Swiss-Prot record:
Its cofactor is Mn(2+); Mg(2+). GO terms for biological process: DNA replication, removal of RNA primer; mismatch repair. Endonuclease that specifically degrades the RNA of RNA-DNA hybrids. Manganese or magnesium. Binds 1 divalent metal ion per monomer in the absence of substrate. May bind a second metal ion after substrate binding. The keyword Manganese applies. Keywords: Cytoplasm, Endonuclease, Hydrolase, Manganese, Metal-binding, Nuclease. The lineage of its organism: Bacteria, Pseudomonadati, Pseudomonadota, Alphaproteobacteria, Acetobacterales. Belongs to the RNase HII family. One of its GO terms (molecular function) is RNA-DNA hybrid ribonuclease activity. This is Ribonuclease HII. The gene is rnhB. It is an enzyme of class 3 (hydrolase). CDD domains: RNase_HII_bacteria_HII_like (cd07182). It comes from the Bacteria. A divalent metal cation binds at residues 18-19, 113.
Length: 199
């Protein structure tokens, strides 16, 4: 379970940052940033974990509790066009920078999930497996996952048949079969695999 030890060791205002959506065949990559109150109640901390370990209902409950606790949370995306122009890593880092810039509170330090840190105007520390280690990063992972899933559900209503409300744009059999049968939409990532040749 993630804890608050890294944040406490750094002192000051610490934001956790994570992204979701690097691997899908369609849709944006979304990042979120979270600054948790130092006195976060233990019953709320117990709700927070790596978003991949939580059900949709658990993620919704955790985010609602975090907002109620006074956590500062923001999210931002990089579009399919930006992914094509920059590459997925650089687009992910762009979304992270945008999420940090949107925070209502400027952090003194940022903890980011993964091996590569975005270029930010404050110190930034990458934490491999951070969404399972840091409460702030885990909170960001929950927010990013919810924001991206909601975006893909909206796109699913505009482009029915690809199953995006269920597969979030990942390359499931249903999604791959739909690409073969229905073709490619403007929200597919060209160059992501043999079904999506470069434009």
């Amino acid at each position: 379970m993630p804890d608050f030890s890294r944040e406490l060791a750094l002192g000051g205002v610490v934001a956790g940052v994570d992204e979701v959506g690097r691997g899908p065949l369609a849709g944006p990559v979304v990042a979120a940033a979270a600054i948790l109150p130092a006195d976060l109640p233990p019953e709320i901390a117990a709700l927070i974990d790596d978003s991949k370990r939580l059900s949709p209902a658990q993620r919704e409950a955790a985010l609602a509790a975090l907002i109620e606790s006074g956590a500062a949370i923001s999210a931002a995306a990089a579009s399919v066009a930006e992914i094509a122009r920059l590459n997925i890593l650089q687009a992910s880092l762009l979304a992270m920078r945008r999420a940090v810039a949107r925070l209502a509170v400027r952090p003194d330090h940022v903890l980011v999930d993964g091996q590569v840190a975005p270029d930010l105007p404050m110190p930034c520390t990458p934490v491999v497996g951070g969404d399972g280690l840091s409460l702030s990063i885990a909170a960001a992972s929950i927010a990013a996952k919810l924001v991206r899933d909601r975006a893909m559900s909206r796109l699913d209503r505009r482009y029915p048949g690809y199953g995006w409300a269920r597969n979030s744009g990942y390359g499931t059999k249903t999604h791959r079969d739909a690409i073969l049968g229905l073709g490619i939409t403007p929200h597919h990532r060209r160059g992501f695999g043999p079904l999506l040749p470069p434009a």
